[in-house]
């Protein structure tokens, strides 16, 4: 048997082993890509589910608030422009936000297999600008998944919420506690409770959220990419429902 024949035999054996390991559940079957928007009110579980999606699809998680802070801290051209507007008490324009997302998609290696957008778009003009940019890159959105939950349950959830500021990972004192009290499971760093995670502040945020989000949901329903998931369920059930929406059983 020649060296070339041996190489071919080894390659075939490796492929067969991988196939058997996948069937046995030893190697996860990594999907090709994901391009999605995650919609949901504060406390619906986006901070729990987005890292799961990122890991499952080997994609980037673009939480627009974190992205904006990172660009400002790194003093990128867009970050400098955004800081100037924020320092004057203004709102960062849709164009700057869409360009920041575009910059991440072009320069962040994690985005090569797709992206999970979280916190954007919040208005119809933002959704239209985002669609236009993504279509020009030939990477249109495939899915908009909405985490749906009753406001009263949200209030109960959020008043016990704990957050790891650096990563955005979130926990709950009752429903999803960290392994060690007030400590992030991954880094061992301390967790915090956000100052705006109180009942009055939350109710105001929810009024704003519903006003902003209903048109966005209608927009994605019209384009045919919207799916709703009951976010009042246990995180593991929410996760399996999200995967079903994405065609993963």
UniProtKB/Swiss-Prot annotation:
Annotated region described as NMP, given as residue ranges: 63-92
Enzyme class: transferase
UniProt GO MF annotations: adenylate kinase activity; AMP binding; ATP binding; DNA replication origin binding
CDD domains hit by this protein: ADK (cd01428)
Primary location group: cytoplasm
LID: annotated segments: 160-197
Location(s) in or outside the cell: Cytoplasm, Cytosol; Mitochondrion intermembrane space
Record-listed ATP binding positions: 43-48, 161, 170-171, 233
Residue span of region Disordered: 177-197
Residues involved in AMP binding: 64, 69, 90-92, 119-122, 126, 194, 205
Pfam families in alphabetical order: ADK (PF00406), ADK_lid (PF05191)
Enzyme Commission designation: 2.7.4.3
Catalytic activity: AMP + ATP = 2 ADP
Keyword Isomerase tagged: no
GO biological process, one term: ADP biosynthetic process
Cellular compartments per GO CC: cytoplasm; cytosol; mitochondrial intermembrane space; mitochondrion
Origin: domain of life: Eukaryota
Coiled coil location: none
Keywords: ATP-binding, Cytoplasm, Kinase, Mitochondrion, Nucleotide-binding, Transferase
Oligomer and partners: Monomer.
Protein function: Catalyzes the reversible transfer of the terminal phosphate group between ATP and AMP. Plays an important role in cellular energy homeostasis and in adenine nucleotide metabolism. Adenylate kinase activity is critical for regulation of the phosphate utilization and the AMP de novo biosynthesis pathways.
Family assignment from sequence similarity: Belongs to the adenylate kinase family. AK2 subfamily.
Name assigned to this protein: Adenylate kinase
